[in-house]
Amino acid sequence: MLVVALASSCTTTTTFNSSQEECDYALHYVLDKANESTLSKLFFRITETQTFISDDLSFILQHADEIPGIRKLLDEWTQSMSRYTLDWFEGFTTYTTSLAKGLQFDDPQKMVLESDFSAALTMESVYGESILSYVKTTLKGADLTKWDEVAAQYNAWTKTRMAMYGEENPSLGDVDIVDDMAAYISMLYFEDLKASETLLRTTPDPNADPTVAKVFGLD
């Protein structure tokens, strides 16, 4: 039995009576569920929303109506990447699911009390670089010729604006689109994983697993 002091306007004490084994079970349970939810959201965000432009490169979209032909090139780029995503996402799903199931928690009780997304934080800490590397390696198999056309058109426009009006615009320079997209997808994955875990751990569910409900105080 773990006795925890909670800080507030006055000090109170509450009893946390879930064992390490129960906490470990509950954390893995919500992590698995959060991963399932995250993968569904992520697939939608990088296919149905038709972006494939990271926040760091959003300046391209901001100027898209001013750059001749770039809307068409952007459409072709997103269509190409959407088709490719259908091929690699199944492998990504299997990979992250396996990592989540095999993740070890050093102190499950402490993790339950630390934050509402401590399992996702541990997943990111332990496997963040591995997931980034996996996405990067996978994206290297994509056809990037459409991106090369987008970059060439955008860079030509920036040079023209500078020559004619002395106007400076962000440059793509030597942007590696594989590195950029891998970082973006990994960021979205962990962002959604934390949000999904938080929702599962703070929302009462009449059909919830009894052990999980007990550990997170939802019973």
Placement of each model-derived feature along the sequence:
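Solvent-exposed aromatic/hydrophobic patches embedded in short alpha-helical segments
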Residues: 26, 30, 34-38, 104, ...
